[in-house]
Amino acid sequence: MKYVDGFVVAVPADKKDAYREMAAKAAPLFKEFGALRIVECWASDVPDGKVTDFRMAVKAEENEEVVFSWIEYPSKEVRDAANQKMMSDPRMKEFGESMPFDGKRMIYGGFESIIDE
C-alpha cells in the first residue's frame, strides 16, 4: 500500500526561486532513498478561512505564500528506511542549513493511502 508524507510550509514570496531550486536538488535524493514521486505546489488559490485555513496552519505572514507538497513511497517500511538514510546522509544536512523558509512552522505527517485512482 502506498504511503505519503505530506507537508505544508510558508515561504517568503521573494524566495520562490530559491525554494524551487532547493526542492529540485532534493527530489533526486528522495528518489534515491526510495520515493516514487515528489510533488511541490505553490499557492495560487488559497482562500482565507473563518476558523482555519492553510495560511493560519503555518502562521504565514503577509509576505509569505503557502507550499503544499507530498512525497509518495511504495510502503511505510520504505519510507521509514528512507528517513533513516536521509538523517545520516551529509547531502541532506546541507539543505537544513540553507532552507529558504522557517522550518519551525512547517506541518507534516505520514499518511496511508486509502484511495488512489
Curated annotation (Swiss-Prot):
Transmembrane region(s): none
InterPro entries: Dimeric_a/b-barrel, DUF1428
SUPFAM superfamilies: Dimeric alpha+beta barrel
Record Pfam families: DUF1428
The name this protein goes by in its record: Uncharacterized protein YbaA
Source organism of this protein record: Shigella flexneri
Taxonomic placement: Bacteria, Pseudomonadati, Pseudomonadota, Gammaproteobacteria, Enterobacterales
